[in-house]
Amino acid sequence: MSSMDTSVNLQEEYNKTEIAKILNLLNEELVGLVPVKSRIREIAALLLIDKLRKNLGITAGSPGLHMSFTGSPGTGKTTVGLKMSDILFQLGYIKKGHLLTVTRDDLVGQYIGHTAPKTKEVLKKAMGGVLFIDEAYYLYKPDNERDYGSEAIEILLQVMENQRDDLVVILAGYKEPMDKFYESNPGLSSRIANHIDFPDYTVEELLKISKMMLEEQQYQLTTQAEVALTQYIAKRKEKPLFANARSVKNALDRARMRQANRIFDSRGQILTKKELVNIEAEDILQSTIFD
Ligand SMILES: Nc1ncnc2c1ncn2[C@@H]1O[C@H](COP(=O)(O)OP(=O)(O)OP(=O)(O)O)[C@@H](O)[C@H]1O
Ligand SMILES: [Mg+2]
């Protein structure tokens, strides 16, 4: 029998992994992020097919899987990084499947000779998993020619190239500084196969995220409160330091506090379950954003 006649069962292989479950969960748990989700699906498909090819003795260089996540604050970069490590583990691409989040200070030392051991220590801990470098652009300080950041980048580059079967590196940060960072470090940029951009959420998406967050904590918006929250989000979006889903999360924490306060002030009443669950419009409208 020629080797071309050998076959594998895609469905069987697919079922062996938990990948379908993870992709579905990803879809359900994360609102919006359509381009991000489709890239993840593509990566998962590539890895699965690669595995099948290997089973049949068709070899291909293992695809580089280093990634770049760019986007505004609170758009889900860290959250997706965690899911990504799950997926890569399920597909057998990484052996341990943990995610280690670091920033510049974990990699770069203050004094001469301190950076290399620091960076190597971090890389050792991350082996078999995902190294998530948050605010990666801080690694490179062009104004300071004695900066030890470039030493860390050198070591990182070598490992990204030579040990790509054992480690996936994700560089994350806000779009503009990351673009500048890559311009100054083309070697790094070109070793990253997947540049994924996280779009800002629309008001509708943020409302949907709010409802999911509340549901998780067994709270509910009244119809009026939902109107108020929609107005709140539209206003908050235009203010400085807006951080997408994180701003919404913080706003909901404050609304819960106001709800508790409101109920507390009405002491003496017998409380119903509904009253304890409901967030009312006034719990939202008391925000200073409406002043
Ligand atoms: N699409 C989404 N659906 C539901 N919840 C989300 C979504 N995106 C983000 N969140 C929630 O919003 C919060 C902030 O997300 P996350 O920390 O992943 O953002 P980030 O992009 O890493 O932000 P930063 O750039 O500031 O580090 C988390 O609590 C996360 O669960
Ligand atoms: Mg983050």
Swiss-Prot record:
It is found in: Plastid, Chloroplast. Keywords: ATP-binding, Chloroplast, Nucleotide-binding, Plastid. It holds the Pfam family AAA. The keyword Disulfide bond does not apply. GO terms for cellular component: chloroplast. ATP binds at residues 71-78. GO terms for molecular function: ATP binding; ATP hydrolysis activity. NCBIfam families: cbbX_cfxQ (TIGR02880). Necessary for the expression of RuBisCO. Belongs to the CbxX/CfxQ family. This is Protein CfxQ homolog.
